[in-house]
Structure formats: structure tokens, C-alpha cells
């Protein structure tokens, strides 16, 4: 009898405990949902108050050299840079190894840039680990050296890498990292991707990429899944010319899309679109960056990505050898690209988008949606208040 009474009491207490746990989970979910609603409302309010020129400017991330006429790598802030950023209201600046000399210089440059603006911006860098590490490969920065992603096989290590990189990036003032690489390496001849990929297993690539996303964003640094729709099955280098993937849509759904789905499931803030053509999917050689079917139809609609879609650098050979900066900018925006990275000529690209809105070539709703996505992430990461 005593055993029965004890068992009943245990069941009651356990049941109460479970109810409390469920109640706490419900409270946390409710708080998260409320926070998301507030961010949504605030983002809409900010976007509604922006001029069309300010909205268009938010859609560009450029190098600081775009505003500097010395012909030298920018390592210190100048009035020209501040004036240029404010003239175009750009959404972000990307720094490369040439801009990053040592910690204090980097912090001062970033703080000076942010302190000169009406709208706070993304400060971006390519910091994947391995051979693509603008900071990690600079001995003066004194940060942990991260192995190539091809060597990462443990989800705990992947998350740790995200935390490590996110920590030193945020301490320096960066808030956007063009990482992780979510490409599945299905063609070993692909040296452009090579050991930047987690390998040829789509599920493993997805698991590792998702954990790095979580680690980076835990430290307040936006992650970028790249290079959609999947650059691991190409042989040529899109920095030099147009790359082509022979994959069919079924192939991509079964392999290439898997890491992106998993990274999106981990709530990656960004996805980067690649300058590769997929003729068996689109029917022509249009780069994915300029394809509405790929960017809007597949990435945003089929995969349900609600964050920011950024192009790969618009000054790469795949684009500049086939399109002018104005034409490429308009096509990319209409395809669904939210941020244009490093156009060959900022003034031409900016004015092409601006004029495209005014003459109806670009729907106003497309610009509003892009700007809303951008501002929402800036609010989420505390870049905007």
C-alpha cells in the first residue's frame, strides 16, 4: 500500500513538474513571438520613414575604397569616406585583409565609420576559417587559427568555431560574416570551393553549417550561407568568368539545397547567391544572381527564406564580362536580391536602381521588401535601435 501511495505522489509531482516545464516553454515562446512582432512593427515604421534614396542605399555593401580617391588601401577613416557613405546611404562596408592591420587600428576604423552615419550599417568580412580568414590569417590580430572546414566533422566543434569567430569579430566591431560555406563538394576539380566545403555529404555539410550559423549569431554576428544554389559542382572560377553547373532541379533538391535548408532552419540571417548558371534548371545561362526563378522562386518561395539575400561580389568576372553595372544591378534587384555586394561602379548601379523605381522598371514593393528585410536584421542584431 505504501508503495502505491508513493508511486501516486511521484506521478503527481512529476506531472506538476512537466506542466511547469510546458508553462515555462510557452512563456518563452510567447516572449519570442512578441519580440519578433515588435521588430516587425519597428522595421516597417523605419522603412516607411525612409526616402526612396535611403532605401536604395541600404541595398549596397561596398569597400571603403569606393569613397577614397587615393588609390591606396583604406586603413584609417577619412572625411571622404564618411561623406560618401552618407551620400549614398549605403547599407554596409566590407573590409578585406588590406584594411586590417592590427586590433586597435581595426576597431578605430570601424568605430569611426559607424559614428559618422544616420543609419548604422553592416560591417562585413570574409572569415570562414581555413584559407579564407582575413583576420585569422593575420598574425598581428592574435586570434585562434581555425582549421579548413573540410577537416570539421563534429557538430560541437562547428558550433565552437562559430562562437570563436563570432567572439573576436564582435569585439573588433564586425557584425556580418560571409560564412559559412554551405556548398556540397560534388566535383573534386572545384578548387575555388575545395577545402572551404565540409565535403561531399549533404547532410554533414548542413549539420556543420547550421552549427556555425548558431555560434556566430549567438555572438551577435549575422551569418551568411553561401553560395546558393550550390557552387560545389562547378569546375570553373566565377571570379574569372561565368561558372556553369550541369545539375538538374531534382539533383539540387536532393543534394545542393539540403545544407541551405538546414542553415535556414538554424535561422541564418543571410544567404549569398552565386554567379553560376544552371541551364538545366533555368533553361539558359543567366547567372543565378540575376534569375528570378532561382532567387525568388526557389530560395525565397520554395525554401521559405525570410532573411536577406545578398549577391556575391558584383565586380567578379562572371558579371562584368557579360553585363554593365547598371544592367546587372537592375536585373539582380528584380530577381530578388536584397543587397548588392561590391558593384563595379557604385554610382552607376545606385542610380540605375533609383531610376528603375522611378520609371517603373523595378516595382516599389520590391525595394520596400528588400529594405524591410535589411532593417529587420539590423534591429535583430542590435545594429539599429
Where are these regions (language model features)?
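Bacterial N-terminal signal peptides
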Residues: 6-14, 126
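Preference for extracellular/luminal or secreted protein segments
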Residues: 13-87, 301-302, 320-385
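Enzymes and membrane/adaptor proteins characterized by extended Gly/Ser/Thr/Asp/Glu-rich
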Residues: 65-75, 84-205, 227, 232-246, ...
Amino acid at each position: 500500500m505504501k508503495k502505491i501511495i508513493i508511486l501516486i505522489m511521484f506521478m503527481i509531482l512529476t506531472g506538476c513538474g512537466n506542466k511547469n516545464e510546458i508553462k515555462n516553454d510557452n512563456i518563452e515562446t510567447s516572449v519570442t513571438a512578441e519580440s519578433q512582432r515588435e521588430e516587425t512593427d519597428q522595421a516597417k515604421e523605419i522603412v516607411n520613414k525612409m526616402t526612396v534614396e535611403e532605401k536604395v542605399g541600404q541595398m549596397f555593401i561596398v569597400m571603403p575604397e569606393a569613397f577614397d580617391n587615393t588609390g591606396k588601401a583604406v586603413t584609417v577613416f577619412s572625411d571622404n569616406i564618411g561623406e560618401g557613405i552618407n551620400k549614398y546611404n549605403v547599407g554596409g562596408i566590407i573590409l578585406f585583409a588590406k584594411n586590417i592591420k592590427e586590433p586597435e587600428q581595426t576597431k578605430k576604423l570601424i568605430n569611426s565609420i559607424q559614428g559618422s552615419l544616420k543609419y548604422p550599417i553592416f560591417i562585413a568580412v570574409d572569415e570562414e576559417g581555413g584559407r579564407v580568414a582575413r583576420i585569422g590569417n593575420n598574425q598581428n590580430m592574435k586570434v585562434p587559427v581555425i582549421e579548413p572546414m573540410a577537416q570539421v566533422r563534429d557538430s560541437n566543434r562547428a558550433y565552437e568555431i562559430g562562437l570563436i569567430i563570432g567572439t573576436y569579430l564582435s569585439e573588433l566591431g564586425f557584425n556580418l560574416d560571409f560564412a559559412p560555406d554551405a556548398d556540397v563538394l560534388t566535383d573534386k576539380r572545384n578548387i575555388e570551393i575545395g577545402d572551404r566545403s565540409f565535403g561531399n555529404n549533404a547532410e554533414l555539410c548542413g549539420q556543420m553549417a547550421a552549427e556555425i550559423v548558431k555560434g556566430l549569431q549567438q555572438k551577435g554576428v549575422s551569418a551568411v550561407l553561401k553560395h546558393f544554389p550550390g557552387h560545389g559542382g562547378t569546375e570553373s572560377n566565377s571570379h574569372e568568368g561565368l561558372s556553369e553547373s550541369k545539375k538538374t532541379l531534382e539533383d539540387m533538391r536532393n543534394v545542393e539545397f539540403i545544407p541551405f535548408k538546414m542553415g535556414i532552419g538554424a535561422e541564418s540571417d543571410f544567404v549569398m547567391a552565386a554567379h553560376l548558371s544552371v541551364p538545366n534548371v533555368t533553361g539558359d545561362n543567366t547567372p543565378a544572381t540575376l534569375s528570378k526563378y532561382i532567387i525568388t522562386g526557389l530560395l525565397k518561395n520554395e525554401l521559405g527564406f525570410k532573411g536577406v539575400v545578398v549577391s556575391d561580389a558584383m565586380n567578379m568576372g562572371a558579371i562584368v564580362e557579360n553585363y554593365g553595372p547598371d544592367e546587372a544591378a537592375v536585373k539582380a534587384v528584380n530577381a530578388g536580391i536584397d543587397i548588392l555586394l561590391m558593384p563595379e561602379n557604385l554610382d552607376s548601379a545606385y542610380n540605375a536602381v533609383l531610376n528603375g523605381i522611378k520609371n517603373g522598371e523595378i516595382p516599389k514593393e520590391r525595394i520596400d521588401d528588400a529594405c524591410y528585410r535589411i532593417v529587420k536584421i539590423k534591429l535583430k542584431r542590435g545594429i539599429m535601435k
